Amino acid sequence: MMMVMMAAGCWFSLPVHSQRISVGKKGLVKVMRTDSTCAQEFVRDEHQSVATRKMAKAAGAAEGVNTLANYLKSDVDLNIPVSKVKQEKTFAVIIANENYQEEVNVEFALNDGMAFREYCIKLLGIPESNLHIRKDATLNNMLAEINWMQNIAKAYGAEARFIFYYAGHGMPDESNGTSYLLPVDGKSNILATGYSMSRLYAELNGLNAACVTVLMDACFSGSKRGEGMLASARGVALKAKAEAPKGNMLVMTAAQGSETAYPYKEKKHGLFTYFLLKKLQESKGKVTYGDLFDYVKTNVAQKSVVVNEKSQTPTIAVSGDLVSTWQGIRLNED
């Protein structure tokens, strides 16, 4: 007897001594006592195919579900200290822009945002309801988050504390060096599609909060994270004009002037974010802004020269109201 089967789009025949052929669950064909190892191979292949389909189905079911395991892959993503402190009046917005529509992507920005979220919840004691994370945020998404912060400020007044974290592209105005954040739907040669730092600072200052912390894993020279320039930027890095924060605001940025904010590929994070998290992890959050910045600046500068063969120097800008006190302030206030 000859049995005809189809596999991988091709028909073939197998000699079979027995007519005991059955179709089991999942359409698996069982062939009993054949003269050829082809039949055994066919059954084995079908087993593998069924297993593959099961895996694909499971992956499809999980699509769109953002779990920590999907993003976090380095030592700072494991063993995150858990604090007993609960900061009920601290609110955080995290923007993680990795996948751009018109520009090159920002490697590991989603890892950065997801990891910082975990530190906010576990180590800083910020309730999940007090934290918004936007992955691949458009300009409207970013404006919506600022509006949310403004509404919080109206309800809580001067008792509220805010953290604004951003990982993604920055861009300069080539005519005057003014800095912009670049949403994923923006283009670096169309300023109207960006979100200016001067506007951001003005709106954050308008919160009239007890303290506003801004953390930027971005550069504003027109360079992309890694090598090269933004697709629509000039072929030279520009020196971005430093914006001055006002009110009770502290701004820590990944790089200065015409420098680039680099990735730390081994750790699957931005270099700046990795060492920011590393210090928080090692200190269990018991670290002042002064010590935190010194650690981040030193380690980023040293590691960048080694792994990227380029300079990267984190900077800090402090509003006039915090000049004399910022070094003693902590993210984890207890």
PLM regions: where:
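Bacterial Sec-dependent N-terminal signal peptides
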Residues: 1-20
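Cysteine endopeptidase catalytic domains of the caspase/legumain-like
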Residues: 18-334
